[in-house]
């Protein structure tokens, strides 16, 4: 156990300074408060654990997080919600044991107070208050741990605010009538009863507590129980407050006491709703995989590919601007009809002695479903030294016995394992056992004969015919998706168990989805080279225009290298001639390349040739590869991005062999090359004269489990067409904000160097942040980012708008049409009713979808001191979706976010190193 007298003590130092000022403010106050002056103890749960003074004379140390959180609480007026009692250190105790920055500041504060001890009492009071203010300001400039901002809360309820919902509505655009995948939930009574459950003798094992309480299930038909706290929709009679249960393991008697604590508003209990709908899914006989539930009885067979598709639903309940709603979306899971064992046998026949290496590539990291209980497991390794004949320890009737996998499955599931010599699949998991503070590692052994693979392999994904057949059932139209919602609502209403479960909590589900009014923003005009102006189209695409007109800013390709193997020589020559033939209409000049034929297509052959031919005068390297190989691609990118920095393009020779498409493919490659060399393709009207727009996204490196790659991309010209990029490597447990601050300072410095002035306005689009991190971002990361401004000048204070981008959402929006429902056009905005209750947020459909159902993107404005209106924020966001140069149309997220995604993926998947500073002002990662 850690010494309680150790720690950094920043927050505790601040607390002690505050307490001292309070004593000075009321010198006549007795050391022990009178009962009248003590705030009334609240029945609300405490968010701060109580502390007791050390009797040994050592003052309380620690990191001081709880003390930091107490600062605001101590200043509350009597009668407000109070924390648990905090007992301060004895006045005779030794100095604080912290060693942090806050403690050093406190020491300086005490020294200054001692030197000025002769000052009048009134001056002392004001001086202490001033010192606290200075101390607070200094501490706000330090990198306080993000954990200090987190407060432990009961997972079953949340704070209910009496404030009205945050309403930020725009007006620009054409109103349209839409429906969405939200369903109103209505409740008769807004009360839940909370009870504490005690066991005598006490039971440490949480699972046993559930069993003991469930012996009296007739009294708790509708309940939520976490092992200690019981929530029920009605008050329990006195007769069921004291019960007796029987321990199923030793037949001993256990007294169960149920003690009333308080009533809660039903709107606090969002968790109860979500648990309830999980139970309703069971009532509907659906099988749970993660957060989704699937109907195995409605499985769609695709026999030609040995696949089956399970339809299902994903649900979530929350309180939105328009009230309490259920979010419902249809989903699908692809499974293989063959077992893992049959796949192993196929690989053994084709690969022979190398079967294990091939199966390792296929299985490691894949998810398999056990056929006997329909559970998912991640495969970590294959153990060919184990088989179903192997034994393991199992507890039976209090005794440990050895049992083989063959006997175990026959005894528990009635399954006869046919192949007794098959290897076992190993899945590793970590769980916290009852009564233990440290997690325990588990090794789960799986029988291949009893497992089905889920999902698709890379080979299957590259099979066009297979993917087309699968998409027939998974990419469902808006009409099909809406029909699935209606079917779900009808199933719940017709299922007596589900209906009674809802009625038990006083709930009912609306018979149809939520209808509302959305807006479609006007199309954006595009600007190309030679002052060409192209009006925007409703579908927000300009594929034909991008090759017809000159690019906005062309970079001529004068000195470049073309690598290819001898067998691809003709492909390379055809590509070169097509490139030179089609470059003039785009306004780009292309000179002859330095040709580098290679003897073979080995990875080291490409690497050696690149290192030899790349010199300081080379603008560009293009490598044509015979086949698609990830290791070769990664090696080429590692050389060109980090070791010998130069813009590079890798082309699969097969894509250039189609003579009917070589012209269009070459044109797209030429556009990419222009961007990688620092050119721009098109632009749109930007309303701000001096602004910098930033995109941030992360990628979790699969080869390094504990490391993530975060990319930072920032504009550095007025038209938002030139981009500066940096990469941060984040180790596990490391705070990313320190790296982001460095990136922001570097980007602002580059902006100053390019424009002669700093931007007046900074807009940050941050991807990869979930709902649970919004408060932390708002209270911790954003203040840290604002500190960067003073580094570039004491008077530099630009406005800051911080927008979180969420694209992995379940929201769907459907346009009402003559034929039922369609996807809404790009530019459709929803900013009310189904938006977050307590956040300034909106949804935008920014891209055109020709197959399936479009998914909008959710934007949460977590901070804004610029004063821009909701209309301006929404239109700017939609404008930025037009500037991604890898696609002649709008994309789902703002261009800087998409650029950041491309960069982090390239570095995390291939380069695994910091790209060279030579490339930071170019889109080398496209």
UniProtKB/Swiss-Prot annotation:
Q: Where is this region: Disordered?
A: 1-62
Example of a GO biological process term: spermatogenesis
Q: Where is the active site?
A: 697, 735, 767, 901
Family annotation (CDD domains): PAZ_piwi_like, Piwi_piwi-like_Euk
Enumerate the subcellular locations listed in this protein's record, separating them with semicolons.
Answer: Cytoplasm
* Cysteines engaged in disulfide bonds, as pairs: none
Task: Say which domain of life the source belongs to.
Answer: Eukaryota
SUPFAM superfamilies referenced in this protein's UniProt entry, alphabetically: PAZ domain, Ribonuclease H-like
For this UniProt entry, the molecular function terms from Gene Ontology, in alphabetical order, are:
endonuclease activity; metal ion binding; RNA binding
Required cofactor(s): Mg(2+)
Which Enzyme Commission number(s) are on file for it?
3.1.26.-
Q: Where is each PAZ domain found?
A: 339-455
Effect caused by changing residue 633 to L: Does not affect ability to recognize adenine at position 10 of piRNAs (g10A preference)
Q: What does this protein do?
A: Endoribonuclease that plays a central role during spermatogenesis by repressing transposable elements and preventing their mobilization, which is essential for the germline integrity. Plays an essential role in meiotic differentiation of spermatocytes, germ cell differentiation and in self-renewal of spermatogonial stem cells. Its presence in oocytes suggests that it may participate in similar functions during oogenesis in females.
Xref: PANTHER family: EUKARYOTIC TRANSLATION INITIATION FACTOR 2C
The subunit structure is:
Interacts (when symmetrically methylated) with Papi/TDRKH. Interacts with Vasa.
So what family is this one in? Belongs to the argonaute family. Piwi subfamily.
UniProt protein name? Piwi-like protein Ago3
**Taxonomic lineage of this organism?**
Eukaryota, Metazoa, Ecdysozoa, Arthropoda, Hexapoda
What's the encoding gene here?
AGO3
